[in-house]
Amino acid sequence: MFAYFSEIIQKVANEKLKIQIYHFPAVSQIPISHKLIEMLLKEYPENITGIKDSSGDENNMLSMCENFDDFDVYAGSETYFLPVLKAGGAGTITATANITAKKCVEVYKAFNENSDVVEKLQHELSNERALLQKACSSVGFSSGLKIIMSSLKNDDQWKICRPPFAMANDSIEKEVISIFNS
């Protein structure tokens, strides 16, 4: 992995290049280790700027926040947003932000204002994320999110999927929306 990132950085050969690493071992089957981050930051401190951690491992995210200065750590799910912020992380980058953005902003503002409602807001955000996952479980996450966005925006264009995904039938759409609205 070090050779992979090195080759990209060297071939681009531009100090303006900024790389946010994506740690999603369930999909990539290749975890981004702390040792790799350490090596990359030592060799390319101007280019390697942060990571989105979609591993679901809160301790890993918090450890990165603690161990790497001037390195932006983003939680890959709203569930870990507040813990990452508290540990000095940058925030969250999440697939569901089209739907949860308002609540994410509320959590972020409450955190920055040291508001005593931040824990309550984070709990609401985590519940919203869990509800989205439940609603999308029967059709797949991407397709389910498209169905929900279509409903929220009253725009069927959101339901269009590219292969290998296919548009859901009406009964599945109704099921997804029913769960989401519960």
Mark where each language-model region is.
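Glycine-rich anion/phosphate-binding loops
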Residues: 2-3
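Catalytic alpha/beta core domains of metabolic enzymes, predominantly
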Residues: 9-17, 24-129, 133-137
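Conserved short secondary-structure transition element at the edge of the structured enzyme core
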Residues: 85-88, 129-163
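Short amphipathic alpha-helical surface patches that mediate protein-protein
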Residues: 123-127, 150, 181
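Flexible C-terminal active-site loop/helix
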Residues: 154-182
